[in-house]
Regions:
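Transmembrane helix-bundle signature of multi-pass membrane transporters/permeases
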Residues: 11, 73-77
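Active-site activation/catalytic loop segments of kinase-like enzymes and analogous catalytic loops
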Residues: 16-60, 76-95
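All-alpha amphipathic helical-bundle segments outside canonical DNA-binding/catalytic cores
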Residues: 62-74
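ATP/Mg2+ or Mg2+-diphosphate-binding catalytic cores
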Residues: 80-143
């Protein structure tokens, strides 16, 4: 018998890939298959709730770097996925299944706009401020 395994499933790495991907997906106000970037924004409310539960649930197992880099992990994953959608569009939609012409191009635009939204919130200090406040509350047993 032969078994195919996706290397993402077994490769060593940081939890930041999974956290970034989860937040990229759930905190984006647009769906991945939206037809316009007008609906794209990044919900800091969802971000705060997710990160609070994540840090609290990890019970001190995260390194300082893993906590500090949560905002950047979202940006990295959104950029990576945006580029992958764009490359697949250019290559003729061979990797990601599509239902209509141009769908992967639209998906790329959504992810790259999301990356831009996240970058703005990182640059302004908003996301890191939220993370620091959550960490302070967790350390003080306030959440």
């Amino acid at each position: 018998p032969i078994c195919m395994i996706d290397l993402d499933t077994i490769m060593p790495g940081t939890s930041l890939f999974d956290v970034g991907d989860a937040l990229r997906s759930i905190a984006n106000t647009a769906s991945e298959d939206d037809k316009t970037t007008d609906n794209v924004s990044f919900s800091t409310e969802i971000f705060e709730k997710f990160v609070t539960g994540y840090i609290k649930g990890m019970c001190g197992k995260l390194t300082t770097a893993e906590i500090e880099l949560i905002p950047e992990s979202i940006w990295v994953i959104a950029m990576e996925l945006g580029m992958r959608f764009l490359k697949d569009h250019i290559d003729g939609n061979k990797y990601f299944a599509t239902e209509y012409d141009g769908q992967n191009l639209e998906r790329a635009r959504i992810q790259l706009k999301l990356a831009d939204c996240v970058y703005e919130k990182i640059s302004s200090g908003e996301l890191h401020g939220i993370v620091h406040e959550i960490q302070r509350k967790v350390d003080a047993y306030e959440v």
